[in-house]
Amino acid sequence: IRERRDARNAPMAQVRGVKQDVMIRHMRANEAVRIKYDTKFAQSSNYWKNSLGMNKCIDSTGLIRQKAEFEKRIRQYQDTTGFLKGKLDFAKMEQMYDKRLEYAKAAMYFRETFIRTNELASRALKYHNGMQVEGPAGKPKKQYVVFKDNSNEWDEALDKEVYAVLLKNYREHVSADFLPDFYKTIDEKFAGDCAAYVNYVWDKSLLMKSGTKLFINKGAVKKDLGIAMGLDITEMMSKLAVPMQDLNDSIAIQERYLCAAKIRMEEDLPHYSDANFTMRLSYGQVGGYDLGGTPSGYYTTAESIVEKMKKSDSVIEYYAEPIMHELMGAADFGKYTDETTGKLQLCFLTNNDITGGNSGSPMFNGKGELIGLAFDGNWDSLSSDIFFDKKLARCIGVDIRYVLYLMDKWGHADRLIKEIGAK
């Protein structure tokens, strides 16, 4: 759990926060850039929020302390019974976890810096990790690869700044042992200026010349700083992966022993398999929860989304097309209005299960009628994979009336509404 908090969640949140600050600034300044990066930003911010939320839950529930107390019970059980003595080694396991945390933290910073963060790094990695080689098979000097023009998917100024900022950030957060060799080039030829390095490589490297033949066995390619950078990144990827895999294999053995000891110690209690990504039926009730002494409520309304849309100048995720302002600000939502509250209800809370793979699952009432679609969990449930608190964990579902309202008024899909017999 400490590894999850400190080596996975914290680095992911930190790097994505840095990256998203740059993205937001460029997206606000240019509508065309906003459209290009809207989905990319949403994908990035999704797990950025998830990481922050999970760490908040881990800390607020004292989860590490609770698990440490539970570990003491297993140790005492082993001391008393001798079960798996000589096999389950807590001291050895602790040492391996500490060592893996070091590598896992560096690996997360590495992944969040170099993998799918900008077009230059992506092309550099693609060149070294599999591209279609063209040209005659028997003539190596005439063999080449070509990058297709995909400039409609990225913005040069944004990607350059993101990469420069991430390179600097990476150096500030990992040991020098985990710096790819091209950092020496940054220091020796660019006086440590990551932005100058990125600008030069982007402008000069054959990697960024879409449609140009890169003859893979000629000197120009071998002298290309972008291609050299890609090789350095690939080599560091292996340097991180090999010890991680060795530690994973050794830890897996100890964790099997630990699981066996837990099951033996609690043999009179039921044990359930992991429900993540399995077919299952979950049941529960609609309702909110206690939020620090204040009832959370169990639904959101059109008014709440209007208030968010008004803040789109400061929070880009709240941006919406003018038609959405019109639809959400309507004086009367007609048949889609809730009879009890008199509101158009958007989302609602239940105490159903919302583990991995549940997004989009249908939610039925006691009559078998579709009332919504599950899609997320509240922040207080984000650590539920490792600690489930039934008082706090809630599933968020989108109200099917809201879905139908948009199908009708925005999508003008009245034919589909009639076809499915919605009422």
Question: What do the PLM-derived regions correspond to, one by one?
Answer:
Residues 1-423:
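Terminal presequence/propeptide segments associated with secretion/organelle targeting
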